[in-house]
Regions:
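Feature captures the catalytic ectodomains and active-site-proximal regions of enzymes
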Residues: 1-362
């Protein structure tokens, strides 16, 4: 059974809105549904928001990391639990069905077909220039218009990519090379005057994908991250609040639970490998997934997780069905073949629950 109240529960969009509302010190009206953060947030001169890719609540809780002592709550990430979906939801302060980036892979029925919506290519990146996306204001554009001193720290290889250009303002984006370089940049006098810093940190996710959650390599990365966030929080003499969350957690998938999917060309298979979007006839879908453990959702059930499309653009990317692969299992459609250890995209507690971690120097 799916959680029909999923969209009513606190999620990463609610967290982002609460942070941004305080960045503006209530000078900009931002509607919030919940109070997720500690009261001392309102004392902060500088607010850091670190998005630790892959640092799921259950994953972190399985370690003896000191960060567990600073976890104040766990909330939901987006559905599906994919990086591009969560990052877009933060920047636009909207749920996926509202901003339009609804999966790792998407399928545009009207023009572009299958799209890798994390790594856009020359053939389909112009979809991001459509009216639907261009009419939306990211928080970074709002910061710029309101003269808020804010910086967005991204790994250098991500700056200038189609997704980055869609979500962020180039003038406030600062590339970094590694942890030491990040600390040096945050120590610069102009940055120390910032009201807000957003830091995207991908390495925990990388280690989990390649080596698996709880692997030695993953544990080493957790330890490095602990040290980094402590230094970031104490880098300034100003009152600094650091809030850490994630886009998803990960699950390790054994080789015997990885299923190659055979299907005819009358089906379009996309989305993620744990939450699989499908276009086509129900008969063909049932045949293709007959040997795959999981449950098939039709549009009405899917709307409890994703919401309903409200315009023609959203209807053109909305799937006919979604197959939720059973926990500890994964499928390989025709366009994906990489053999990893850790995966995400599904609805398990490990994937969907993310922590709110709060640190301060006051």
């Amino acid at each position: 059974m799916i959680n029909k109240n999923f969209l009513e529960e606190p999620n990463i969009v609610d967290l982002a809105k609460e942070i941004f509302k305080e960045v503006f010190q209530n000078k900009l009206e931002i509607y919030t549904r919940f109070s997720l953060l500690s009261d001392d947030l309102y004392e902060a001169d500088t607010i850091n928001f670190i998005l630790a890719d892959g640092l799921g609540y259950e994953n972190l809780n399985s370690t003896d990391s000191y960060l567990n002592k600073n976890v104040t709550k766990s909330i939901n990430t987006t559905f599906p639990s994919s990086t591009n979906v969560a990052l877009s939801s933060i920047s636009f302060m909207k749920n996926p069905i509202e901003h339009g980036l609804i999966g790792y892979y998407m399928y545009d029925k009207s023009q572009y077909g299958l799209i890798n919506a994390l790594n856009w290519n020359e053939d389909n990146k112009n979809l991001l220039l459509s009216d639907h996306f261009q009419k939306q204001n990211s928080i970074w554009k709002i910061f710029k218009e309101n003269k808020i001193y804010a910086s967005n720290f991204q790994p250098r290889n991500l700056v200038g990519t189609p997704l980055s250009d869609c979500l962020y303002e180039l003038s406030s984006t600062i590339p970094y090379d590694d942890e030491q370089n990040l600390l040096e940049l945050l120590s610069e006098s102009t940055i120390l005057e910032n009201r807000f810093n957003f830091i995207y940190y991908p390495l925990i996710d990388v280690m989990a994908h390649i080596f698996g959650v709880n692997s030695e390599e993953w544990q080493i990365e957790i330890t490095k991250f602990e040290k980094l966030v402590n230094e970031i929080t104490n880098i300034s003499n100003k009152k600094t609040k650091t809030i850490i969350s994630a886009d998803h957690g990960l699950v390790n998938i054994n080789t015997e639970n990885r299923h190659d999917l055979n299907y005819s060309d009358d089906l379009q298979i996309y989305g993620d490998q744990r939450s699989v979007y499908i276009n086509g006839s129900k008969e063909s879908v049932l045949e293709a997934f007959s040997q795959i453990p999981g449950v098939l959702l039709e549009k009405q059930e899917l709307s409890c997780l994703l919401g309903e499309p409200t315009n023609e653009f959203l209807k053109s990317i909305y799937p006919d069905f979604c197959f939720l692969v059973e926990d500890k299992n994964i499928i390989y459609p025709k366009h994906l073949s990489a053999q990893l250890n850790g995966y995400h995209g599904g609805l398990s507690q490990e994937e969907i629950k993310i922590p709110i971690i709060e640190l301060s120097n006051y």
